[in-house]
Amino acid sequence: MVSIRPDEISSILKQQIADYDKSVSVSNVGTVLQIGDGIARVYGLEKVMAGELVEFEDGTEGIALNLEDDNVGVVLMGEALGVQEGSTVKATGKIASVPVGEAMLGRVVNPLGQQIDGKGEMATTDSRLIESIAPGIIKRKSVHEPMQTGITSIDAMIPIGRGQRELIIGDRQTGKTAIAIDTIINQKGQDVICVYVAVGQKQASVANVVEVLKEKGALDYTIIVNAGASEAAALQYLAPYTGAAIAEHFMYQGKATLVIYDDLTKQAQAYRQMSLLLRRPPGREAYPGDVFYCHSRLLERAAKLSDAMGAGSMTSLPIIETQAGDVSAYIPTNVISITDGQIFLSSDLFNSGLRPAINVGISVSRVGGAAQTKAIKKIAGTLKLELAQFDELAAFSQFASDLDEATQKQLGRGKRLRELLKQPQFDPLNLAEQVAIVYAGVKGLIDEVPEEEVVKFARELRDYLKTNKAEFLKNVLSEKVLSEASESMLKDAISEVKSSMLAA
């Protein structure tokens, strides 16, 4: 018979007691009562926070948006095919956050900051809350540096400054995204980090944008956040906030950033869908009462920070799609009232061949004038007025049979100015080229050039300046003013190009 040794037993017990870990893990859990249409009603989760991330049994994440007496309304961020009635839900104790940092440059991510471009994981250690409070008055500085878009009509007449919020608004297929992409391409070499947020877009359209940016060498300083049309409404709603959080990280490091939200109409529709399914009371056009706050808290995060805060900036270009040019609808009027100006694109102008199809008469920039460079401000001062007068005269001349010489001359100049401002897609102009083109039109130096030859003249003038007057381009780009020496060089170039064209 085996003898029992008490000392052995006591040593084993002592060892077990020494190894015993009495830490207790407490989880805040609940049970799914009802699920459907991307919304789950959950019983339990007593200590859940508003906006807290929750995790379902199958790993799907959701956000607790409605905290009611007897249940919690959770919006799902995914298909959640494995979630059913009775499934367990666990509160994570975390608010939605996104990875940020230099490693994200050139990458395509989803609204949760996870890579979706197949290039492998991103080596980021920093993260930032998706929702954060906008900088206060003391932390800000007035907008005073230009954000060149490379589009002559915008930089000359509707200038944008770093830290501004400028709305791009127009019907579908009027070139809204093209303006945004041109602006990103034009930031090459300007030390600006760009974030392009695609909300509810076709995957093919986003792939095309990525391809264009890669081709133009602009993907190296751009981050793309994509919540496609097939994604859950919660992800489409979150995408703009994710883009803002990624840009904010760089802004607080003292860098200049540019964020494009393409487009906020689809974000508002996703938010409306979520709110109605959560049984929140509908308001105008069935949008919830806080849809204004949804956009204002996003766009207020754009800022030009004070020197004490590092002097970084975040410029926002939100895009809104209108129906049949109706800017008095609910979402367009909301966003117009939040932003510092709007660029209005007209389908009539687009179809008549004027591209970019900017309606200069009703487009404004409320703070950009202070940021405009002296070189273009000096010569473009009368441009907007001349085009407005031309539009009036053109409308009037349809009914008049014979026009006096002065009116005919004014109409001719207006038509040539219109032609000068035409610009091909993905071909932004630098400041010096814009100065040259606007100068030629405003000073009446191309009044003899036939109307149909004006676009060709602008192209040839750019080529001539690059090959024969490189000093002019260098001077204007470095000094940001049009000096007398530069002006005489420009006059020579214009007369040279004009005479060679007219001789031909």
Curated annotation (Swiss-Prot):
State the Gene3D superfamilies in the record: 2.40.30.20, ATP synthase alpha/beta chain, C-terminal domain, P-loop containing nucleotide triphosphate hydrolases
Gene Ontology molecular function, alphabetical: ADP binding; ATP binding; proton-transporting ATP synthase activity, rotational mechanism
Tell me the residue numbers annotated for binding ATP: 170-177
> Which InterPro entries does this UniProt record tie to the protein?
ATP_synth_asu-like_sf (IPR023366), ATP_synth_asu_C (IPR000793), ATP_synth_asu_C_sf (IPR038376), ATP_synth_F1_a_nt-bd_dom (IPR033732), ATP_synth_F1_asu (IPR005294), ATPase_a/bsu_AS (IPR020003), ATPase_F1/V1/A1_a/bsu_N (IPR004100), ATPase_F1/V1/A1_a/bsu_N_sf (IPR036121)
What EC class is this? translocase
A GO cellular component annotation in the UniProt record: plasma membrane-derived thylakoid membrane
Q: Where in the cell is it found?
A: Cellular thylakoid membrane
UniProt KW Membrane keyword: yes
What keywords sit in the KW lines? ATP synthesis, ATP-binding, CF(1), Hydrogen ion transport, Ion transport, Membrane, Nucleotide-binding, Thylakoid, Translocase, Transport
* Keyword check for Glycosyltransferase: no
> What reaction is this protein's catalytic activity?
ATP + H2O + 4 H(+)(in) = ADP + phosphate + 5 H(+)(out)
What PROSITE patterns does the record point to? Answer: ATPASE_ALPHA_BETA
Q: Where is this site: Required for activity?
A: 363
> How the protein sits in the membrane?
Peripheral membrane protein
Which CDD domains is this protein grouped with? ATP-synt_F1_alpha_C, ATP-synt_F1_alpha_N, F1-ATPase_alpha_CD
**What Enzyme Commission number(s) appear in the record?**
7.1.2.2
Assembly and interaction partners: F-type ATPases have 2 components, CF(1) - the catalytic core - and CF(0) - the membrane proton channel. CF(1) has five subunits: alpha(3), beta(3), gamma(1), delta(1), epsilon(1). CF(0) has four main subunits: a(1), b(1), b'(1) and c(9-12).
Q: What does this protein do?
A: Produces ATP from ADP in the presence of a proton gradient across the membrane. The alpha chain is a regulatory subunit.
Matching entries from PANTHER family are given as:
ATP SYNTHASE SUBUNIT ALPHA, MITOCHONDRIAL (PTHR48082:SF2)
- Which family, according to the similarity comment? Belongs to the ATPase alpha/beta chains family.
Could you tell me what this protein is called? ATP synthase subunit alpha
Q: Which species?
A: Prochlorococcus marinus (strain NATL2A)
